[in-house]
Regions:
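Bacterial N-terminal signal peptides that target proteins for export
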Residues: 1-11
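Bacterial N-terminal signal peptides
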Residues: 9-19
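Boundary at the C-terminal end of the N-terminal hydrophobic targeting segment
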Residues: 20-24
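Flexible, processing/modification-adjacent segments and terminal tails
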Residues: 31, 38-68, 74-75, 83, ...
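N-terminal, post-signal-peptide region of Sec/Tat-exported proteins
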Residues: 67-98, 202
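Broad, structure-driven detector of short, well-ordered beta-strand segments within folded domains
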Residues: 91, 113-117, 195, 257
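N-terminal post-signal-peptidase region of extra-cytosolic proteins
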Residues: 101-108
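Gly/Pro-enriched, hydrophobic low-complexity segments
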Residues: 135, 155, 171-274
Length: 282
């Protein structure tokens, strides 16, 4: 297991362009494995299932914007014994209507590929064939180990049943530990989650994602959260500055997601359509 304290030292600095991201990504190596923090040092306080559910609702609300959302996403995909791959994309959301759009812009061979989600329906688009295909939440985004949910708002209280697992310590952070199991009829990337939440700031710091059989599939870390003021929400929206995802099936494989230029201004109404996405490749 990776030490969260060590992980913080390896965050990528401010990224302003794809070329800058490419240069910084070359310098960043994965931190070494470290022993898990001693659980005995964690402060033990009462933490019930009701408390856990309320905390999960708080996490959802902090990330939710009542209006629209735009972000520039940089993704570094690393596979063992291979050269890392770098991607740039645009992420668009309309949270109050459950609409989501993901559009690759770089590298050239990926540009124009896209994902569109409207309510419960998710499609992918390949401009080389001009075809749309239905997708599930479990499928990877493009050639990366990311999922659509890595870029969307949090809906854990709506999609999962919540159980408190007590308190813990993650690096220097006192945390609450929570287990979530998918509700019947919900389409999610992973049917079971374990999350570690900072007791002080109420931000998610770590996540483990499991298959239906209980096998650990991915571990994700959130070293830093940024606040962006939302005029429509009349409050702050919390956005992860960076997400580090470690593949637990293929050891040595990892994904780094960096989110920049987050904008919460209203988008054009005709954007969340197949026609709009197709027009970007003509």
């Amino acid at each position: 297991m990776l030490s969260f304290k060590i992980l913080l030292k390896f965050s990528i600095p401010l990224i302003v362009s794809f070329s800058a991201f490419a240069e910084e990504a070359k310098k960043v190596e994965l931190p070494p494995k470290a022993e898990s923090p001693a659980k005995a040092s964690a402060t033990t306080i009462k933490f019930t299932d009701t408390d856990a559910f309320e905390l999960v609702k708080t996490l959802d609300d902090k990330q939710r914007n009542s209006g629209d959302y735009t972000a520039l996403a940089f993704v570094k995909e690393t596979e063992r014994n291979k050269e890392p791959k770098l991607y740039q994309s645009l992420v668009y959301r309309r949270d109050d209507m459950n609409k989501f759009m993901f559009l690759f812009t770089k590298p050239k061979e990926e540009a124009g590929k896209a994902y569109l989600k409207i309510d419960k329906n998710l499609w992918s688009y390949d401009p080389s064939t001009g075809k749309w295909e239905r997708r599930t939440e479990r499928e990877k985004i493009g050639g990366t180990n990311s999922r659509r949910s890595d870029f969307d708002e949090s809906r854990m209280a709506e999609e999962y049943d919540v159980k408190a697992e007590g308190t813990d310590q993650l690096g220097s952070y006192q945390v609450f530990k929570i287990t979530l199991k998918v509700k019947e009829g919900k389409d999610v990337a992973y049917p079971m989650l374990k999350i570690w939440v900072d007791q002080k700031e109420k931000n998610e710091l770590k996540r483990e994602e499991y298959s239906l059989s209980g096998k650990l599939m991915r571990s994700s870390y959130y070293p830093k959260w940024n606040k962006v003021y939302s005029e429509s929400k009349k409050g702050d929206v919390y956005v992860p500055d960076e997400i580090r995802i470690f593949d637990e099936l293929e050891k040595g494989n990892s994904t780094i997601i960096v989110l920049k230029e987050v904008d919460l201004k209203k988008l054009d109404d005709n954007m969340f359509t197949k026609a709009w996405i197709e027009s970007k490749t003509k």
